[in-house]
Amino acid sequence: MYKKNIKIRNLGLRRIQDVCSSMNDFTITRKISTPDEIWLVQHYPVFTIGVSGTKHDVLVSNNIPIIFSNRGGKITYHAPGQLIIYVLINLFRRKLTVRRLILLMQNIIISTLKSFSIDSYILNNFPGVYVNNKKICSLGLRIRNGCSFHGMALNINMDLLPFEYINPCGNSFKMTQVIDIKPNLCFKIIKLMLMHKIREIFS
């Protein structure tokens, strides 16, 4: 009988190419018995363009690498101080629709932020999580053989300026981050709370 457990891996600061290669390999080779995993990681500065995006979404690259990704969505920016949450879930086994998985993922972020008295919300037709009409968390998924990969990016304490160089996720929302709302919070405390919320929802 299947037990709803989940493994959380803390990968530290890694090149996005290396992590995406490992994530693709994990998804392609996983079996029905393979435990679901969540990977927490930070990436070096990089723009990633999803399957719905084009290079026209880059206004100025400013020597930041641009990488095409097989995730859903358009363009976004990753850098240290942003917590990437890769969600490697077998939807069939958990009896989840894609829509339900996305709601669960967004609720993890909302619940985590609520723990620090930050009120956040979702918007119809605009995936992600928002605070005061600014985006604090981006979301882009891919499903292969009933299993999810890619995930979310929560802005915590990073340089937001490069978001001005792009049309993020194909919309005009400004970006925000936790440190701008609650300056005394640190990356580690937020990550620990997020891990707790992940286990609450997926275990």
Curated annotation (Swiss-Prot):
One of its GO terms (biological process) is protein modification process. In the reaction, the free carboxyl group of octanoic acid is attached via an amide linkage to the epsilon-amino group of a specific lysine residue of lipoyl domains of lipoate-dependent enzymes. Residues 32-203 form the BPL/LPL catalytic domain. The active site is at C169. Belongs to the LipB family. GO terms for molecular function: lipoyl(octanoyl) transferase activity. The keyword Cytoplasm applies. Substrate binds at R71, G72, G73, K74, I75, T76, Y77, H78, S138, L139, G140, G151, M152, A153. The record marks K135 as: Lowers pKa of active site Cys. CDD domains: LipB. NCBIfam families: lipB (TIGR00214), PRK14342.1 (NF010922). It is found in: Cytoplasm. InterPro entries: aa-tRNA-synth_II/BPL/LPL, BPL_LPL_catalytic, Octanoyltransferase, Octanoyltransferase_CS. It catalyses: octanoyl-[ACP] + L-lysyl-[protein] = N(6)-octanoyl-L-lysyl-[protein] + holo-[ACP] + H(+). It comes from the Bacteria. Keywords: Acyltransferase, Cytoplasm, Transferase. Catalyzes the transfer of endogenously produced octanoic acid from octanoyl-acyl-carrier-protein onto the lipoyl domains of lipoate-dependent enzymes. Lipoyl-ACP can also act as a substrate although octanoyl-ACP is likely to be the physiological substrate. This is Octanoyltransferase. GO terms for cellular component: cytoplasm. Pathway: Protein modification; protein lipoylation via endogenous pathway; protein N(6)-(lipoyl)lysine from octanoyl-[acyl-carrier-protein]: step 1/2. It comes from Buchnera aphidicola subsp. Baizongia pistaciae (strain Bp). Its EC number is 2.3.1.181. The gene is lipB. The keyword Cytoplasm applies. It is an enzyme of class 2 (transferase). PROSITE patterns: BPL_LPL_CATALYTIC, LIPB.
